[in-house]
Amino acid sequence: MIVFKNKVISLEDEQYSLYLLNKPKGYICSNAQDNKNRVIDLIKSNSRLYTIGRLDVNTTGAILVTNDGDLANKLLHPRYDKEKKYLVRTFIDIPKDKYIKLKKGLNIGKRQKAKGVIKRIKKENKHIYWEVILTEGKNREVRRIFKELGSAVIDL
């Protein structure tokens, strides 16, 4: 609402949208104009859109997209301590004594520690499926965790 000299000039209700999108490989979660294949370009909207979460270009999966910047901030900013859940597929089975180290913190790079929970879900044919729960989700964090544990990620 805009008021000028005690008179209402315009009254607009903000309309917020929230989309659940199955992000395909080859698309990035960025608003930068110079990037090709942005997730937000898959949705026709006249509003500025924000991805809630970051999945790297080679990752597929559910991602939320909204035009509500406050909601995006509350779900993304580390101070709100929101969990992010990932399903990971690997070829290599990792011993439990290795992957439980993530609870206390696992070194994944230069002065970077990842904290979270990994749970082995099932083994199917040659593949092992894992559930990973993190509260941050830094740049390629899940892939770096599995690399540190001695396994490459097939699908994320």
Predicted regions, residues:
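Basic, flexible Lys/Arg- and Gly-enriched helix-loop patches that mediate nucleic-acid binding at interfaces
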Residues: 1-156
